[in-house]
Amino acid sequence: MTELTVNQPLNYRNTGFITSAPDIRHLPQDTGVEIAFAGRSNAGKSSALNRITDQKGLARTSKTPGRTQLINMFEVTQGCNLIDLPGYGFAQVPLELKIKWQKALGEYLQKRECLKGLVVLMDIRHPMKDLDQQMIFWAIESRLPVLVLLTKADKMKSGARKAQLLKVRESSKSFGGDVQIELFSSLKGIGLDQVRRKLDTWFGPELERQLMLAAAENGETYTGESLSDKSDD
């Protein structure tokens, strides 16, 4: 009997780069499940992706914030992709380019059908800037769940970061929608397991869909927990 399960956590160490695109029109086919990562240019987005996948060089970190202008796609497993969106809000980027990026980000959040969750990263010392809030509003308008990561949590002492977490959680209630706030540190691994569990939850329906297709192709019955061969009944 062949047994397949949807409950086992994904191995994010297997994540690999697929492609880069200047906008939504140049992305691969709109299928599977995508989880997007967004944040200001100095929020530590690339470092977070590298820590989540346990790969130091997966997402390129730049010493010049605002340099990454492309949408970068990474595959965790078939049909499950992580999307690294261009950083926003860096002062030295020309206004015309800022407007172009913001338009591309809004278009992606509102029109990409396979997008099923948004991770917004914010420096814990400077959370909820105007553009951060705009990203969350766009997601809510598109009925997307949002995970806000207060990055660089190691920069604050334990008591101070807990107080900041509670403060941001309280202020986020005004958004409505599904918005979860958590602490995160790429350096210390704070919040790492929580992020991976959330990603597993968001990817779950796609993995279940694949199991159902595999069951049909192999003459098996999908029970919701595993696939059991009919011939063994």
Curated annotation (Swiss-Prot):
Keyword ATP-binding: no
Disulfide bonds: none
Cell division found in the keyword field: yes
Gene Ontology MF terms: GTP binding; metal ion binding
GO cellular component terms attached to this protein's record: cytosol
InterPro entries registered for this protein in UniProt: G_ENGB_dom, GTP-bd, GTP-bd_ribosome_bio_YsxC, P-loop_NTPase
UniProt-annotated binding residues for Mg(2+): S46, T68
Annotated positions binding GTP: 39-46, 66-70, 84-87, 151-154, 184-186
Domain EngB-type G: 31-205
Essential cofactor(s): Mg(2+)
UniProt KW keywords: Cell cycle, Cell division, GTP-binding, Magnesium, Metal-binding, Nucleotide-binding, Septation
Signal sequence segment: none
Family to which the UniProt record says this protein belongs: Belongs to the TRAFAC class TrmE-Era-EngA-EngB-Septin-like GTPase superfamily. EngB GTPase family.
Known function: Necessary for normal cell division and for the maintenance of normal septation.
UniProt protein name: Probable GTP-binding protein EngB
Lineage: Bacteria, Pseudomonadati, Pseudomonadota, Gammaproteobacteria, Vibrionales
